């Protein structure tokens, strides 16, 4: 296993397999790879093949990576996505983030290929609000996707990005649906990446709008394996994950991932602005499979060496998070006198859970 200069291990590879999407969400972060929106289906040709992903999976696993998340765009648009799942499943757990629209057609085959779980982006269950967010009237299709995934035996977590003035009141409706159908719920603040950078000030809604009531309902508070997410387990058994990345050093403390774009570049962070170590270039050079695996390992190590937390605690008082301009005078440890509410429950004491 390898770790970065701040002691954070590299355990997860987040892979965008396509920039295409059948929706057009106005806040899409596009995995940090571009500030423009997704491409239309049929307008892009794959850069990396199934064999390439097999080599990437083996190289990553040799370095200690044991988890792969497939994203896009919309990963289900890619026709060979089940084959990509199958090769990566040889090396670790494979999960996927999807809008769910195509899950009724593909959930069963993905389960057979080795997919363990899905995150379904469902920011509203109102047809009108869903269309305002995604620019398509497709909420019924997305809901059918959730049901298809559950029927196929996949673990399901629904992602809801809180948007001020649009869907704040819908969280509790989604929670009731989660309890009825048996999926978990993840509430996310808008990321200042991709399109989200331009709309952050207008639409960001801190998740404390739901957290206070959640905390009074919960039977247990846990910590997610990735990003130190706060997780509230409710009496029904449903877990609600909270994702609040903005100006949150605790979130950065729990980052164990590198991102692979659809064109074969590696991003040490969703907010990264370059340089971009290229897996695609390493694979183009040919050679035996073993030679390719070693070259990809080298590129992954280069990306790991570039990993830096976006937000850290200031050394002199240990209380106020800031984005560093240099690595001097900063630390990535919980401060002794932290007063931020997000630290009050103690990340270090809450039970650690997968997912």
From Swiss-Prot:
Cofactor binding note from Swiss-Prot or TrEMBL: Binds 2 [4Fe-4S] clusters. Binds 1 [4Fe-4S] cluster coordinated with 3 cysteines and an exchangeable S-adenosyl-L-methionine and 1 [4Fe-4S] cluster coordinated with 3 cysteines and the GTP-derived substrate.
Names of the cofactor(s): [4Fe-4S] cluster
Keyword annotations: 4Fe-4S, GTP-binding, Iron, Iron-sulfur, Lyase, Metal-binding, Molybdenum cofactor biosynthesis, Nucleotide-binding, S-adenosyl-L-methionine
Entry keyword Amino-acid biosynthesis: no
Binding site for [4Fe-4S] cluster 2: 252, 255, 269
Protein residues bound to [4Fe-4S] cluster 1: 21, 25, 28
Protein name, entry field: Probable GTP 3',8-cyclase
Protein species of origin: Aeropyrum pernix (strain ATCC 700893 / DSM 11879 / JCM 9820 / NBRC 100138 / K1)
């Amino acid at each position: 296993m390898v770790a970065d200069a701040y002691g954070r291990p590299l355990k997860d590879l987040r892979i965008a397999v396509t920039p295409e999407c059948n929706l057009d969400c106005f806040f899409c972060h596009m995995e940090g790879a571009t500030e423009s929106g997704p491409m239309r289906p049929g307008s892009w040709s794959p850069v990396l093949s199934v064999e390439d992903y097999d080599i990437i999976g083996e190289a990553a696993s040799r370095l200690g990576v044991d988890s792969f998340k497939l994203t896009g765009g919309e990963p289900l648009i890619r026709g060979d996505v089940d084959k990509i799942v199958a090769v990566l499943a040889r090396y670790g757990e494979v999960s996927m983030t999807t809008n769910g629209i195509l899950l009724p057609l593909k959930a069963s085959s993905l389960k057979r290929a080795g997919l363990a779980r899905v995150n379904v982006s469902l920011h509203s269950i109102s047809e009108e609000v869903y269309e305002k967010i995604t620019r398509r009237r497709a909420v019924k299709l997305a809901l059918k996707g959730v049901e298809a995934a559950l029927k196929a035996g996949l673990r399901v977590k629904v992602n809801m990005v809180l948007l001020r003035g649009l869907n704040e009141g819908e969280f509790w409706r989604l929670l009731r649906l989660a309890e009825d159908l048996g999926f978990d719920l993840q509430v996310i603040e808008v990321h200042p990446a991709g399109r989200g950078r331009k709309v952050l000030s207008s639409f960001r809604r801190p998740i404390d709008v739901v957290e206070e009531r959640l905390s009074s309902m919960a039977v247990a508070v846990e910590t997610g394996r990735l990003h130190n997410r706060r997780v509230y387990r409710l009496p029904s058994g449903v877990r609600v994950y909270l994702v609040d990345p903005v100006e949150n050093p605790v979130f950065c403390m729990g980052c164990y991932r590198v991102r692979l774009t659809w064109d074969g570049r590696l991003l040490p962070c969703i907010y990264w602005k370059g340089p971009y170590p290229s897996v695609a270039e390493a694979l183009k050079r040919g050679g035996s499979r073993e030679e390719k695996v070693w070259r990809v390992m080298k590129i992954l190590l280069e990306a790991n060496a570039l990993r830096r937390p976006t937000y850290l605690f200031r050394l002199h008082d240990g209380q106020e998070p800031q984005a560093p301009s240099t690595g001097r005078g900063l630390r990535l440890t919980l401060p002794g006198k932290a007063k931020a509410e997000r630290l009050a429950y103690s990340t270090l004491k809450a039970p650690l859970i997968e997912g």
